Curated annotation (Swiss-Prot):
GO CC, one annotated term: cytosol
Organism listed in the record: Synechococcus sp. (strain WH7803)
EC number from the UniProt entry: 3.6.5.3
Protein name: Elongation factor Tu
Region (G4): 136-139
HAMAP family: EF_Tu_B (MF_00118_B)
Length: 399
């Protein structure tokens, strides 16, 4: 069977459902596909299809995630739904499923619960830019006042985590009734998707951001100079442009005198390309894996940062024993291991803990032995002798 061509006639946006267990995230996901399928904008997926999510491995961590796609009148969406709470935590920290925005599902029968809060906090820390609220199970609440109270509570909660709680749309839905085909609840799913279209901003394309390429390998070509290879993470680089080499050693400038891909010469390389860049006046020993080539002034190297970290369980290939403050692992950042130290940590809710056990989630302060190009929202792995023992995201740059 020939593969279907991916139509690029609508902007593509990645979203997901987040919220407390049993508040109806998966049912709502199924409802969206059911309602949109009637307009020919989705394939019907039922609860079991989505709930039986296959296991995926990202950075050595096993995560269950379901991927659903559908479109509205103006956009094409890829939607992720995770069956278990632990899967969400891992997913958001490793960035396995990038989210440009999320639908926060909260049951009107319960109101915001522990994981509702945790998912909002996670969304804030890993940089999910916008949320829309689906107040689910509204068919089960007869009293309009109760629904209004729950809505107020959610808005206050969102504001307390620096989301614009007063402005975020809250749509009253019933995933179950929409699947059963009740017209008024189907209309509510349409209303929800209109809110998603209008309130989750179209992501800035990687190509439009300032140029960055992490160096994976370095060669010297006799008579031509030094070539750095890697995958361009974002932006565009043109032949003749000045760039900076950042990280590990002092930042220095150079000019790109050639861009090659698959042994062919190009005028420019763009986000997603695996290229070799010929650098003027640079010796092979001046640069190494782990440095980044960037648009001048767009990024600075740092040594101290705060991060949100998930520490792998023993069964996931992690440590068998706890670690304490002062622990010195390697931090795998973009393309290389950099030795560093975890100088301090707290539990994910900010409470003090003496030690970190396999399977814990922590906030940590890390200090690297040499400065590298780290940015807020960037993912990293924590490794020990080449095996991953944790995954994290940079929540704040300190210095």
């Amino acid at each position: 069977m020939a593969r279907e061509k991916f139509e690029r006639n609508k902007p593509h946006v990645n979203i997901g459902t987040i919220g407390h267990v049993d508040h109806g995230k998966t049912t709502l996901t199924a409802a969206i596909t059911n309602v949109l399928a009637k307009k020919g904008q989705a394939k019907v997926q039922d609860y079991a299809d989505i709930d039986g999510a296959p296991e995926e491995r990202e950075r050595g961590i096993t995560i269950n995630t379901a991927h659903v796609e559908y479109e509205t009148d103006t956009r094409h969406y890829a939607h992720v739904d995770c069956p278990g709470h632990a899967d969400y935590v891992k997913n958001m920290i490793t960035g396995a499923a990038q989210m440009d925005g999320a639908i926060l599902v909260c049951a009107a029968t319960d109101g915001p619960m522990a994981q509702t809060k945790e998912h909002i906090l996670l969304a804030k820390q890993v940089g999910v830019p916008a949320l829309v609220v689906a107040l689910n199970k509204c068919d089960m609440v007869d009293d309009e006042e109760i629904i209004e109270l729950v809505e107020m509570e959610i808005r206050e909660l969102l504001s307390s985590y620096d989301f614009p709680g007063d402005d975020i749309p809250v749509v009253q839905v019933s995933g179950l009734k929409a699947i059963e085909g009740e017209a008024e609840w189907e209309a509510k799913i349409d209303e929800l998707m209109q809110a998603v279209d209008a309130n989750i901003p179209e992501p800035e394309r990687e190509v439009d951001k300032p140029f960055l390429m992490a160096i994976e390998d370095v060669f010297s070509i006799t008579g031509r100079g030094t070539v750095a290879t890697g995958r361009i993470e974002r932006g565009i680089v043109k032949v003749g442009e000045e760039i900076e080499i950042v990280g590990i050693k002092d930042t220095r400038k150079t000019t790109v005198t050639g861009v090659e891909m698959f042994r062919k010469l190009l005028d420019e390389g763009m986000a997603g390309d695996n290229v070799g860049l010929l650098l003027r006046g640079i010796q092979k020993e001046d640069i190494e894996r782990g440095m980044v080539l960037v648009k001048p002034g767009s990024i600075t190297p740092h040594t101290k940062f705060e991060g949100e970290v998930y520490v792998l369980k023993k069964e996931e290939g992690g440590r068998h024993t706890p670690f304490f403050a002062g622990y010195r692992p390697q931090f795998y950042i973009r393309t290389t291991d950099v030795t560093g130290q975890i100088t301090a940590f707290t539990a994910d809710d900010g409470s003090d803990v003496e030690m970190v056990m396999p399977g814990d989630r922590i906030k940590m302060t890390g200090e690297l032995i040499c400065p590298v190009a780290i940015e807020q929202g960037m993912r990293f792995a924590i490794r020990e002798g080449g095996r991953t023992i944790g995954a994290g995201v940079v929540s704040k740059i300190i210095e």
